[in-house]
Regions:
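Positively charged, low-complexity intrinsically disordered leader regions
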Residues: 1-30
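Short beta-strand segments enriched in small/hydrophobic residues
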Residues: 31-40
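Short beta-strand segments
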Residues: 38, 94-98, 167
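Glycine-rich phosphate/diphosphate-binding loop of Rossmann-like nucleotide-binding domains
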Residues: 39-53, 136-232, 237-240, 247-260
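Short beta-strand elements in bilobed, periplasmic/extracellular small-molecule ligand-binding domains
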Residues: 56-70, 188-190
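Short, well-structured alpha-helical segments in soluble
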Residues: 76-88
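Anion-binding alpha/beta catalytic cores of soluble intermediary-metabolism enzymes, centered on
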Residues: 92-159, 216
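Rossmann-fold NAD(P)-binding glycine/threonine-rich loop
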Residues: 108-119, 124-132, 233-292
């Protein structure tokens, strides 16, 4: 059975580090602060907002919420972004996306209105460019691929000279994860829906980051002994036993039992990457405050 790369251990270490750093900032009179912009009241947004607020309180980050009605206009949203851009007490901003359907055509313009130094979840073009250029002090990488890197770092998984495969090419996970693995000196291949020999490519990898978003798409045919699997996806498996004794629970891309029986290490779903992302968001806010 593979070693489980548990997100809780990574999160606990991150939180302890952040508590020390926020205390040091507060001694200097700097209160690291996250601004949350939400248009409407989507249940998943509200759930994430609640979790983020709780995590912020734990590590010493303040939260300021900017709630707009579901029918807010482009001008309404831009006005709020201008407000947080001008507020020096706000160091990082999270805006829930996707925006409501009537703002879909304007989402690109709205996202890029945010000051890149406050873009803690990579929603501006400048932050995306920073990921491809190696970041430095230009914005922040998306929280999910950053969480993948935190897991690799925490468990001492050296990427240098390793073959890494990323399944998925989205701007949210796949592409930035590939760039970040390159930054760790891995040799990276991206597989996607048009790749014809994904299983063969994956078997030759040392590290697999799966962000396909397809239940049971990563099977025993894709893996071999010695590999590390980072399963990013959140899927619904109607046949998976749940905590209430019934069926229906979240799962990743990996057909977990058969893959875990072969590879050396794997992140579970739930309890893996997803549990680390909120602490990564707080880390980005703290880093933004330290840069300010």
């Amino acid at each position: 059975m593979a070693k489980l790369l548990l997100g809780k251990e990574v999160t606990d270490a991150l939180n302890a580090n952040l508590q020390t750093r926020t205390a040091a900032l507060r001694e200097k009179g700097i209160v690291p602060t996250l601004g949350i912009i939400r248009v409407g009241a989507d249940p998943s947004d509200l759930s994430y907002e609640k979790g983020a607020t709780k995590r912020a309180e734990l590590v010493g980050v303040e939260v300021k919420k900017f709630e707009l009605p579901a029918d807010a206009t482009k001008e309404d949203v831009l006005a709020v972004i201008d407000q947080v851009n001008a507020d020096d007490s706000i160091h990082g901003v999270l805006m829930f996306r996707p925006l409501p359907k009537h703002l879909k055509a304007d989402q690109n313009e709205i996202c890029n209105r945010l000051a890149p130094q406050k873009d803690v979840d990579c929603m501006t073009h400048l932050s995306n460019a920073g990921v491809f250029e190696g970041l430095g002090d230009l914005g922040f990488a998306p929280c999910t691929p950053s969480a993948c890197m935190e897991i690799l770092d925490y468990y001492g998984i050296d990427c240098k000279g390793k073959n890494a495969v990323v399944i998925g090419r989205s701007l949210v996970v796949g592409k930035p994860a590939a760039m970040m693995l390159l930054g760790k000196n891995a040799t990276v291949t991206i597989c996607h829906t048009k790749t014809v020999n994904t299983a063969e490519i994956c078997k030759n990898a040392d590290i697999i980051v799966s962000a396909a978003g397809v239940l049971n798409s990563l099977t025993a045919d894709y893996v071999r002994p010695g590999q590390v699997v980072i399963d990013v996806s959140i899927n619904w498996d109607e046949n998976k036993p749940n905590a209430k004794g019934g069926k229906g629970a979240i799962a990743g891309d990996a057909k977990f039992e058969e893959v875990a029986a072969i590879v050396d290490a794997i992140t579970p779903v739930p309890g893996g990457v997803g549990s680390v992302t909120t602490s990564v968001l707080m880390k980005h806010v703290v880093e933004a405050a330290e840069r300010a």
